[in-house]
Amino acid sequence: MQEKQVVNQKEQYDLNKLQKRLRRNVGQAIADFNMIEEGDRVMVCLSGGKDSYTMLDILQNLQKSAPINFTLIAVNLDQKQPGFPEDILPAYLDKQGVEYKIVEENTYGIVKEIIPEGKTTCSLCSRLRRGILYRTATELGATKIALGHHRDDILQTLFLNMFYGGKLKGMPPKLMSDDGKHVVIRPLAYCREKDIERFAIAREYPIIPCNLCGSQPNLQRQVIKDMLRDWDKQYPGRIETMFSAMQNVVPSHLNDHKLFDFKNITHNSEIVDGGDLAFDREELPLQPVSWQPEDAEDGDTQPLVRLDVLEIK
């Protein structure tokens, strides 16, 4: 009995530590990108997966101690997929005391009618879903739309665009929607997927599987995801350093003439960003700049992604 109590205490300690890290990461992202402002009504898009559950949980937690006032409303889109468990989310949200709205739209039927059998439905489904969510945000008077993409999603998108699209382009933490009417935010932008996975298991969220539609998986994204996971195992800190690189861009040392005016460099020009280091051996740290041991206490080291003071505590 005593041994069980010790185990439970250890589990609770680990959960508290994990929640603290996620709170800090979300708070940093909100502060860095001014995601949530005084009086905002944030529409939290809830799919029933681990990411959106965690996002709602952490935002609720931050709401209690934030120096600003904002409200949350969870929104789920019931796309009428066969086998979709309609009772799970309402039961969970009622228990949590969260304001919510379930939007019912038969996008599944539309997609199945248009897309041939065996073809990937994700692109059309995503466009339909996006339009419905934008419309719902307007109806609810939401000033921000929160999506549950995390740090790993952002890095995967960066590599997808580099490998398959020929672009140095990731997934922005904050953007204007393509209809020009809504501000979309990603509060989990600094959160690691493995932290979210552990948190979701500990919280015992009622996860709804995302394969109900029967669509083929995005094989390109899965290849990138597997590659990054392998790197994370073999080279600790590499993922953190790559994410830091996305926040430390040096346009004068890339090749995009739209970002930097190469044409007007002359003999009289000033040295920019250290000049040409191509012939010099660049000094690099032995460990990745953002690396820290997996079991390090929060606050033991300061990752490079943040240097200033957190605004939401």
UniProtKB/Swiss-Prot annotation:
The answer to whether the entry has keyword Iron-sulfur is yes
Q: Which GO terms describe its cellular component?
A: cytoplasm
The UniProt keyword set, sorted, is:
4Fe-4S, ATP-binding, Cytoplasm, Iron, Iron-sulfur, Magnesium, Metal-binding, Nucleotide-binding, RNA-binding, Transferase, tRNA processing, tRNA-binding
Q: Kindly list the positions annotated as binding [4Fe-4S] cluster.
A: 122, 125, 213
Q: Annotated motif PP-loop motif: location in the chain?
A: 47-52
Describe cofactor binding as the record notes it.
Answer: Binds 1 [4Fe-4S] cluster per subunit. The cluster is chelated by three Cys residues, the fourth Fe has a free coordination site that may bind a sulfur atom transferred from the persulfide of IscS.
Q: What is its main location?
A: cytoplasm
Checking InterPro entries in the record gives: Rossmann-like_a/b/a_fold (IPR014729), TilS/TtcA_N (IPR011063), tRNA_Cyd_32_2_STrfase (IPR012089), tRNA_thiolation_TtcA_Ctu1 (IPR035107)
- Molecular function terms from GO: 4 iron, 4 sulfur cluster binding; ATP binding; magnesium ion binding; sulfurtransferase activity; tRNA binding
A Pfam match is: ATP_bind_3
Disulphide bridges in this chain?
none
Q: In which pathway does it act?
A: tRNA modification
Entry EC number(s):
2.8.1.-
Q: Which cofactor does it need?
A: Mg(2+); [4Fe-4S] cluster
Places the protein is found: Cytoplasm
**What family, per the record?**
Belongs to the TtcA family.
Binding partners and assembly: Homodimer.
Beyond the main fields, what else does the record say? Answer: The thiolation reaction likely consists of two steps: a first activation step by ATP to form an adenylated intermediate of the target base of tRNA, and a second nucleophilic substitution step of the sulfur (S) atom supplied by the hydrosulfide attached to the Fe-S cluster.
Role: Catalyzes the ATP-dependent 2-thiolation of cytidine in position 32 of tRNA, to form 2-thiocytidine (s(2)C32). The sulfur atoms are provided by the cysteine/cysteine desulfurase (IscS) system.
Q: What is this protein called?
A: tRNA-cytidine(32) 2-sulfurtransferase
Q: Which organism is it from?
A: Yersinia enterocolitica serotype O:8 / biotype 1B (strain NCTC 13174 / 8081)
